Curated annotation (Swiss-Prot):
First-tier enzyme category under EC: transferase
Protein location: Cytoplasm
Main function: Component of the acetyl coenzyme A carboxylase (ACC) complex. Biotin carboxylase (BC) catalyzes the carboxylation of biotin on its carrier protein (BCCP) and then the CO(2) group is transferred by the transcarboxylase to acetyl-CoA to form malonyl-CoA.
Zinc finger (C4-type) in chain: 33-54
Catalytic activity: N(6)-carboxybiotinyl-L-lysyl-[protein] + acetyl-CoA = N(6)-biotinyl-L-lysyl-[protein] + malonyl-CoA
Complex and partners: Acetyl-CoA carboxylase is a heterohexamer composed of biotin carboxyl carrier protein (AccB), biotin carboxylase (AccC) and two subunits each of ACCase subunit alpha (AccA) and ACCase subunit beta (AccD).
Co-factor requirement: Zn(2+)
Pfam families, A to Z: Carboxyl_trans, Zn_ribbon_ACC
Organism: Ligilactobacillus salivarius (strain UCC118)
Annotated pathway: Lipid metabolism; malonyl-CoA biosynthesis; malonyl-CoA from acetyl-CoA: step 1/1
Protein name as catalogued: Acetyl-coenzyme A carboxylase carboxyl transferase subunit beta
Ranges annotated as spanning the membrane: none
GO cellular component entries: acetyl-CoA carboxylase complex
Keyword list, A-Z: ATP-binding, Cytoplasm, Fatty acid biosynthesis, Fatty acid metabolism, Lipid biosynthesis, Lipid metabolism, Metal-binding, Nucleotide-binding, Transferase, Zinc, Zinc-finger
Length: 283
């Protein structure tokens, strides 16, 4: 009995010691990949914030992506102000918080960028700005991006990340789909290149409009791409669908996108694509 009492005492001391040590360990050191479920030490994500196992690109702010994507950037339309046309409960507070967190006036960052002396119009959607939803200012900024690109004879590269149209703005947000699509059409009629890069997640009205209108449609690995979410689909058709139904790899196999591109390769390959399509007489 004495032996068991000693073991109990040792165990209690060990538990207390571990508990104290555990309290000093900061949170966020280990992150679980939402796609492959592998536990990742936070520093192993690197500057690109990608899973070293399956190459899934973790969701990042638009300005964070900008830091490693381009050499120079001139931002446009920072003065546009999002309104609350429906006086939707809590919308103003959500906007203020999203603007403070993202340092954007709405869910997309737009401007003129350069990589290796290649100039192009660039748009980057922010998945953390009210789920990257598309409101009237988002639509206006993207429309102006294409209009400027058409005037300046520039290609457009647009990184999409969105939960769809912003419900707090009602029908006005849905109207942005046709508004942007018209600007995309005019840009295309001018014989200019449009590249979309799908990032996680790209859904709803953004998928149903400008995200899938690119001349070249690329995607990051394991990005979710679809119109309705998996749960909505299952409730509609009353049957289970595969977990990877809307993964970029499945969408690629079915011919809806052209290629999958890792984050560390994006700067070089996007510049190369713009260069070869700007060569006179290349095709």
């Amino acid at each position: 009995m004495q032996l068991f009492d000693e073991l109990k005492t040792i165990s209690k001391k060990h538990i207390k010691a571990n508990k104290k040590a555990g309290e000093k360990v900061p949170s966020g050191l280990w992150i679980s990949c939402p796609k492959c479920q592998q536990s990742i030490y936070h520093k192993d994500l690197g500057k690109y914030k990608t899973c070293p196992n399956c190459y899934y690109g973790f969701r990042i702010h638009a300005r964070e992506r900008l830091e490693w994507l381009v050499d120079t950037f001139q931002e446009f339309d920072t003065d546009l102000e999002t309104k609350d046309p429906l006086n939707f409960p809590g919308y103003k507070e959500k906007l203020i918080k999203a603007q403070q967190d993202s340092k954007l006036n709405d869910s997309v960052l737009t401007g003129i960028a350069m990589i290796d002396d290649v100039e192009f119009a660039l748009g980057i959607m922010d998945p953390y700005f009210i789920m990257g939803s598309m409101g009237t200012v988002t639509g206006e900024k993207i429309t102006r991006l294409f209009e400027r690109a058409t005037q300046k004879n520039l290609p457009v590269i647009l990184f999409t990340a969105s939960g769809g149209a912003r419900m707090q703005e009602g029908i006005s947000s849905l109207m942005q789909m046709s508004k942007i699509s018209q600007a995309v059409k005019e840009h295309s009629n001018a014989g200019l290149l449009y590249i979309t890069v799908i990032t996680d997640p790209t859904t709803g009205g953004v998928t149903a409009s400008f995200a899938m209108q690119g001349d070249i449609i690329l995607s990051e690995p394991r990005a979710l791409l679809g119109f309705a979410g998996k749960r909505v689909i299952e409730q509609t058709i009353h049957q289970k669908v595969p977990d990877d139904l809307q993964d970029a790899e499945t969408v690629l196999k079915n011919g809806f996108i052209d290629n999958i591109i890792k984050r560390e390769d994006q700067k070089e390959k996007l510049a190369w694509l713009v260069k070869i399509h700007s060569m006179k007489g290349a095709f």
